[in-house]
Amino acid sequence: MKFLDQVDLRVSSGDGGKGVVAWRREKYVPKGGPSGGDGGDGGSVYVEADENLYTLMDLSHNTQVFAEDGEPGGRREQTGASGEDKVIRVPPGTVVKTQTGEVLGEVVEPGQRICVAEGGQGGRGNAFFKSSTNQAPRESQPGEPGEERDLTFELKLMADVGLVGFPNAGKSTLVSSVSAAEPEVADYPFTTLTPQLGMVYVSEYETFVMADIPGIIEDAHEGKGLGLQFLRHIERTSVLLFVIPITSQDLGEEYEALLHELESHEASLLDKPRVVALSKIDILAPDERALLPDVVADEFPDDVPLLPISAVADVGLDQLKYTLFDTVHSTQSADAIDA
């Protein structure tokens, strides 16, 4: 299925049904009183998270979504039927915004629902206006109009670990090696053109979800490259995994450049715990691999784990999975306590 993470859609809730003017028509009651019923309420438009959806592609086939109008009131004070609500189903992690950028809400948990356009209230029939001083009112109300809104649906993938790196750092190879995901892998930049999710199994009962996004390039925050438009997908992650190949001319400089691009997009990303995977170590001899963390330690902060790996040669992947799982677990436990 093609991946789509942003869609514009016009939503329209239903108008309220009109109230009616009617009179009782009963045998032996020549002057029956008012009996006009109220109109039904218009249907509302809701957005609901569906755990079976992973993309907004289904929404791209429509330009507008309508809920039903309410029915007019009837005789004998019958209230008109309410219009049927319209439910827009989206993947968990979807944010709904107005065209001005105002966030109406987000749906994170499966089944969570928010109202994005409320139906109009039904109008009053003449029976409502009867009083001691007005026994035969001829007044009724039209229904209130529904709402029409132009909305933007923005998907932020739900993952535990977000991969960060420049193009051709080996992120896609890593995801395919530690999970069941099958991203395109090739020896040229930008093989990842859309975000990829992979479930990583540490043990039978210990798992986490990893998200790979297109590689970032320098000055991505100025609109260059592909990665910046997908950075929203790592905003919800608990841990950031920086993938830096040892073939880089300056490992520390590459790490700082990635931090700069993240901060330019969303400063709060730098508050997340980080792990650095030094990739492509299969080009080194075994004795050189073991010394690598000590050799490059001065180029990275002391509190950031440095893990040499080779996804191609299956070196260091188990240790990477254990470290990531422990970091995710401790971070989420701390967040739960703070909440």
Curated annotation (Swiss-Prot):
GTP binds at residues 165-172, 190-194, 212-215, 279-282, 310-312. It is an enzyme of class 3 (hydrolase). NCBIfam families: Obg_CgtA, PRK12297.1, PRK12299.1. Its cofactor is Mg(2+). GO terms for molecular function: GTP binding; GTPase activity; magnesium ion binding. It is found in: Cytoplasm. InterPro entries: G_OBG, GTP-bd, GTP-bd_Obg/CgtA, GTP1_OBG_dom, GTP1_OBG_dom_sf, OBG_GTPase, P-loop_NTPase. Residues 129-138 have a biased composition (Polar residues). Mg(2+) binds at residues 172, 192. Monomer. Keywords: Cytoplasm, GTP-binding, Hydrolase, Magnesium, Metal-binding, Nucleotide-binding. Residues 66-86, 125-148 are annotated as: Disordered. Its EC number is 3.6.5.-. Residues 1-158 form the Obg domain. Its main location: cytoplasm. Residues 72-86 have a biased composition (Basic and acidic residues). The keyword Hydrolase applies. GO terms for cellular component: cytoplasm. Residues 159-329 form the OBG-type G domain. Pfam families: GTP1_OBG, MMR_HSR1. The keyword Secreted does not apply. It comes from the Bacteria. This is GTPase Obg. One of its GO terms (biological process) is ribosome biogenesis. Belongs to the TRAFAC class OBG-HflX-like GTPase superfamily. OBG GTPase family. An essential GTPase which binds GTP, GDP and possibly (p)ppGpp with moderate affinity, with high nucleotide exchange rates and a fairly low GTP hydrolysis rate. Plays a role in control of the cell cycle, stress response, ribosome biogenesis and in those bacteria that undergo differentiation, in morphogenesis control.
